[in-house]
Design a protein with these regions (language model features):
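CheY-like receiver
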Residues: 73-77, 115, 206, 234, ...
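Hydrophobic alpha-helix immediately C-terminal to the catalytic Tyr-X-X-X-Lys motif of short-chain
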Residues: 165, 169-173, 203, 263, ...
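C-terminal substrate-binding subdomain of Rossmann-fold SDR/epimerase-dehydratase oxidoreductases
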Residues: 207-327
Length: 327
């Protein structure tokens, strides 16, 4: 099978490309190497890892998903599945430049869809986000996990809004043009190669160095942290199963919710040092909890996460140490 992966040099994209090639697929990776959220050198490092893949099974093309001509050159008619991971991520940065997020995430996805429509391609796997659920007042996170059929009417950030708009955009293309879509709602992914702006990366580095970490709020906000290997298993299963004319949404999470304070304590145990904590008020755009019900993904994709946070953080720390990246 020939798979196009957009955002191929990113955190999730690079791992997905490696897994697909290992499974025997041919992969064309596309990435803009944008330095907006973090230095482009980080993606260059990921690309160096991808360069070790067999040249007859993997190629990496530099292209912006918003550039129609570039995407026309990058995506050919022999493609079986498009795995669209490219996007501007991050809740807080989206508050500063919402128009930039709209252009990349909405227009860029539209360019990908139009290229697929022009070629008659009909199988797409899309990276959505748990942020589409927004704030759910009155829901006890420890009891009620997020289900795919829960209302998603109040995204708390421009980033979240773009991801929900993407889901509607993709549904429309299924209805009008028969493009099959599996939209995967990722829940706080972490692990080797994670973005440097992510909380776990920042906390691990600061605690290891003995420098202060900043906690927004009282530490009670909760996240469903999901290790990269589990996420990629779900992505590859979706690529194998997506079919023309189908539109499905699946949660991909770790199935347990951990408070920010608990996360800090896990990192302290793994790194072997105590955190120096500076507290700040809650930030706009943050939601109090995310928590995935993955029953639908388990039934349809065979998705079964196997990495609890303590083990995942330990594996991430081991990777930092083994690759000389540990502070």
């Amino acid at each position: 099978m020939h798979v196009v992966v957009t955002g191929a040099a990113g955190f999730i994209g690079s791992h997905t490309c490696e897994r697909l090639v290992a499974a025997g697929h041919r992969v064309t990776g596309i990435d803009a190497f944008d330095g907006y959220l973090y230095p482009a050198e980080v993606k260059r490092g990921n690309a160096a890892e991808l360069a070790r893949l067999p040249a007859d099974r993997f190629q990496l093309i530099t292209a912006d998903i918003c550039d129609r001509e570039a995407m026309a050159r990058a995506i050919g008619g022999d493609v079986d599945v498009v795995c669209h991971l490219a996007a501007l991520a991050g809740v807080r940065p989206s508050l500063e430049e919402p128009l930039r997020y709209l252009r990349t995430n909405i227009e860029g996805t539209g360019v990908v869809l139009e290229r697929m429509r022009a070629l008659g391609l009909a199988r797409l796997v899309f990276a959505s986000s748990s942020s589409v659920y927004g704030v759910r007042p009155g829901v006890e996170a420890e009891v009620v996990a997020f289900r795919e059929d829960d209302p998603c009417l109040a995204p708390a950030s421009p980033y979240a809004a773009t991801k929900r708009m993407n889901e509607l955009q993709l549904s429309t293309y299924r209805d009008l043009f028969g493009i099959g879509v599996f939209a995967l709602r990722f829940f706080t992914v972490y692990g080797p190669r994670q973005r440097p702006d992510m909380a776990i990366n920042k906390f691990v580095a600061a605690i290891a160095r003995g420098t202060p970490i900043t906690l927004f709020g009282d530490g009670s906000s909760r996240r469903d942290y999901t290790f990269i290997d589990d996420i990629v298993s779900g992505v590859v299963a979706a690529i194998d199963r997506v079919a023309p004319g189908r539109y499905e949404i699946y949660n991909l999470g770790g199935t347990q919710t951990v408070s920010l304070q608990e996360l800090v304590e896990i990192i302290e145990r793994v790194v072997g040092k105590r955190a120096v904590i500076e507290r700040r008020p809650l930030q706009p755009g943050d939601v109090p909890v995310t928590y995935a019900n993955v029953d639908r993904a388990r039934a349809a994709l065979g998705y079964t996460p196997t990495t609890p946070p303590e083990l995942g953080v330990a594996r991430y720390w081991a990777w930092l140490c083994d690759t000389g990246r540990a502070p």
